[in-house]
Structures are given as structure tokens and as C-alpha cells.
């Protein structure tokens, strides 16, 4: 189960209810709550896990999983489904499986089966689970549900995201450049705290291993605190790392501040602007422990664009 800090229990329950109605896509729900699609997926996955029966097994058991899933046939009468061109939701014996064109390679085939009233086949297609017994690429090794970098096991929110993407059949290798960039950070505390920032689920990782965050600035693009740093689109803003406070118990202190989407609504004024910034994981110095790990202090970032209209 995922620990989702940026949404209340009631908000998560409402997301599950609306998504199950078939009237909203994951992206629409993400825009509504001001979070990422990853957050919505985790909410839905938690809901699925909560419905599954708990089984206790004792004794010595050996299990071997490969990429070909064996699925028991299901009776048509046990299947409830909703579908559109943008999403599919199929419930079998109280367990719900969701798919979108971006998350399931067989989306169109499943949709065609539902339209043709071939519910058993559609349920089987959407329920295919893929697992990798062993994966090795460069310094990264995934084995037995664990990730190792240079033979050292890593446990973190980032690792959870990689393993989750692998389970869904998504491109989990996309995260490796980010992992390598992160390990360039000289602060072990910053590395660990950045994983907490990722768990906030508002973080978009780029192909070159950076990540996007957000910043509230004045109407003239200068920073709100000192009015000395120009945050106009295209600018690279930086300061010596040694001048950034690395104490994550201090909320407001020295450093270049950026935040997640969920923090934007708690800050700024009617004349403020919001800019999207690109940050190298190496340049993260500290993440204050308040506000659900939703903001951080860095020593450098690049301003990508003005996104004020997205937050109105």
C-alpha cells in the first residue's frame, strides 16, 4: 500500500468513486486535485489492494513467475465493466482492474472485446501481470523484487516507483538516468529526503534524469523573499551550495526554494506568477520536514516556462 500524503482519505475515496463511475479519466482527476497522474494511479491501486482477500500461508513454498501469466477463466455473470475511448474499468469478483491507452498495451483489444460482449476474454486480457525474474543493466540489477546499484540494495520511494512501473509493463528504465544523477549528490540526507519528495507524487522526471518542480515568484519574475534572483523563463538561477541551509528541520532559511504542485495553493498572492523549473538531483540540498515534504532548497535550477495560467 502506498502512503499518499498529499491527499486526505476523503479525497482519495472521492477519486475512486468518480473514476469507477466511468465519467472521468485519470488525467482529469489529477488536474482536479492538482496532483500528478502517478498520484491518481497509486490511489486506485491502494483501493484495489484493499479489496483483495488476505491469505496466510505456512510451510515451505517455492514460486516461480515468468512473463506469461496463467489466468483462470471467469464467469460472465461475475463481471462488471465501464469503458470509453480513454479508459476501461473491469470488476471481477469485487476486484477492479483499470487500463488506459498509456498504461496497457492491449487497451484497444480489450475495448473491442467488451463491445463484442466477450467479457471473459476482456477480463483475462486486462488481468495479465508481468514479472521479471532477473534484470541487469550496467550498474543496476533487479532481482527478487529488490533493486541493487553497484551491488548495494536501495530502498526508497524511487525504487518503489521503478518496481511499480516494471510490474505494470511500463518503461522502468526511464528512471535510471535520474537514479544515477541522484547518486551524484554529496549529501546522503538530501538523497534520502529527495525520495520523500518523490513520494509526494507531483514530480515529473525528465529523460535526461532531471526533474520538474515549481516556484512562486513576483509579477516581475524576481524571487518573493529577497527580490534579487531573476526567475524569467530561460534563466539559470544558482548560488554556492555552501550558502544553502542543509538543516531540514528549519522551514524558511537560506537557499533557492522550489516546490511540488500541492504546495502552490498555500503560497503566493493574486499578483504572483508561477514558473516551472528543471532541477538536477545533485543540486538538492535539503527538504524541510513540514508541509508533507512538498518543498525544498536547492543551489541551482533552470527556469523552463511561466505556468501561471495552470494554477488559476
Curated annotation (Swiss-Prot):
Protein's GO biological process: DNA replication
The keyword DNA-binding belongs to this UniProt entry's keyword annotation: yes
GO cellular component: host cell plasma membrane; membrane
Any one GO molecular function term: DNA binding
UniProt subcellular location: Host cell inner membrane
Keyword field contains Cytoplasm: no
Keyword line: DNA replication, DNA-binding, Early protein, Host cell inner membrane, Host cell membrane, Host membrane, Membrane
Function field: Transcribed prior to replication. This protein form parts of the replication complex and has DNA-binding properties.
Protein name, UniProt field: Protein rIIB
